């Protein structure tokens, strides 16, 4: 992420792009990156819309959990619009720095010398608001894991009647609380008031709390399921189908969470490798690694949605059957079967007619 410095006020801003005034638009490689980036964005948008619709129509989990998953996944479109605003600055189509011929590749800097110094006549607001909303998206994805985990805590707490009572206030309050945390975080980060080390430590802490919470929920729900299987209840507990169903749903959601953690860990490992390679200054290939790292910011939603899709056979089947190419193949196959059955029935009717004709002449 490039840090830019405003001369007139002395303020610094942390912009969530890995390059500024990039000259990659001059050679043909720019068109390769542009086509690849556009294809990824179109594919991600299509998959997210389809998956959110599937979540709301095929209710594998409770409505509250489905609503929260759709909300956090659809925030990708917020990040997409912010990224569209930032791209002209990134590729030097709109120049804002004092040295318009210099290309800035940086992760973070706490010195003015390594920052991009802005011209006095620059309108900072478009790049500022776009950066703010992109930071907000990244923090929202981080806190989404914690928020969905808290929804499962509520499901465990109200285990006797959670399936029968909607309790729409739970996802509303959790989404509102998440934004009350992420909006100030995004403001502090955009204004470069949060050091890089502090940002990393906070992210690690939040992830650790979420993982610990999921482990505890897993153990509690497994213990309850074992009690139901063994019919061992305490004096203030009672068996009910709603309780059994909710325990099974909690366990399914925790298995889903485990798959999300594994896929997110692999994704973070790949991004870390890209960052490590970039820090070693690969001469001649720096543009490739910079843009690979830059595009990785909008990929978590795609990784999460594909992982969620693979967790339910019903979701996966609906998604695959709804693909345009699959629909065409199915429609042509149905038409072929209908024509074949029509021809077959017509042939049988003809044979029956001639058989009756022969018998009448016999």
Swiss-Prot record:
A Pfam family recorded for this sequence: Sre
Compartmental location: Membrane
Positions of transmembrane segments: 29-49, 67-87, 127-147, 170-190, 204-224, 260-280, 288-308
GO CC annotation, single: membrane
UniProt entry keywords in alphabetical sequence: Membrane, Transmembrane, Transmembrane helix
One GO term (biological process): sensory perception of chemical stimulus
Lineage top rank: taxon: Eukaryota
Matching InterPro entries: 7TM_GPCR_serpentine_rcpt_Sre
Primary site of residence: membrane
Bilayer disposition of the protein: Multi-pass membrane protein
Family: Belongs to the nematode receptor-like protein sre family.
Name the UniProt record assigns to this protein: Serpentine receptor class epsilon-37
């Amino acid at each position: 992420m490039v840090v830019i410095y405003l001369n007139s006020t002395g303020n610094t801003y942390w912009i969530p792009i890995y390059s500024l005034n990039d000259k990659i638009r001059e050679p043909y490689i720019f068109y390769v990156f542009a086509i690849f980036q556009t294809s990824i964005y179109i594919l991600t948008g299509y998959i997210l819309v389809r998956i959110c619709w599937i979540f709301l129509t095929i209710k594998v989990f409770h409505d509250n959990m489905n609503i929260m998953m759709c909300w956090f996944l659809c925030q990708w479109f917020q990040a997409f619009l912010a990224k569209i605003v930032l791209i002209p600055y990134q590729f030097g189509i709109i120049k804002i720095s004092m040295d318009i011929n210099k290309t800035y590749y940086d992760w973070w800097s706490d010195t003015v010398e390594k920052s991009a110094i802005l011209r006095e006549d620059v309108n900072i607001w478009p790049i500022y608001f776009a950066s703010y909303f992109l930071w907000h998206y990244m923090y929202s994805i981080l806190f989404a894991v914690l928020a969905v985990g808290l929804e499962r805590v509520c499901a465990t707490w109200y285990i006797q009647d959670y399936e029968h009572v909607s309790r729409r206030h739970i996802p509303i309050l959790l989404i509102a609380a998440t934004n009350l945390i992420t909006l100030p975080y995004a403001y502090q980060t955009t204004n470069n008031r949060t050091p890089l080390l502090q940002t990393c430590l906070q992210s690690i802490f939040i992830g650790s709390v979420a993982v610990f919470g999921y482990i505890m929920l897993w153990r509690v729900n497994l213990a309850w399921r074992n009690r139901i299987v063994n019919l061992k209840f305490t004096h203030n507990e009672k068996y009910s189908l709603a309780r059994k169903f909710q325990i099974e749903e909690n366990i399914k959601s925790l298995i889903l969470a485990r798959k999300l953690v594994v896929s997110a860990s692999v994704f973070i490992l790949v991004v870390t490798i890209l960052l490590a390679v970039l820090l070693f200054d690969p001469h001649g290939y720096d543009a490739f690694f910079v843009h690979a790292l830059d595009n990785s910011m909008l990929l978590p939603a795609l990784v999460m949605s594909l992982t969620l899709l693979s967790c339910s056979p019903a979701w996966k089947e609906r998604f695959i059957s709804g693909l345009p190419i699959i629909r065409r193949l199915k429609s042509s196959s149905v038409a072929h079967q209908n024509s074949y059955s029509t021809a077959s029935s017509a042939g049988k009717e003809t044979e029956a007619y001639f058989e009756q004709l022969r018998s009448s002449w016999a």
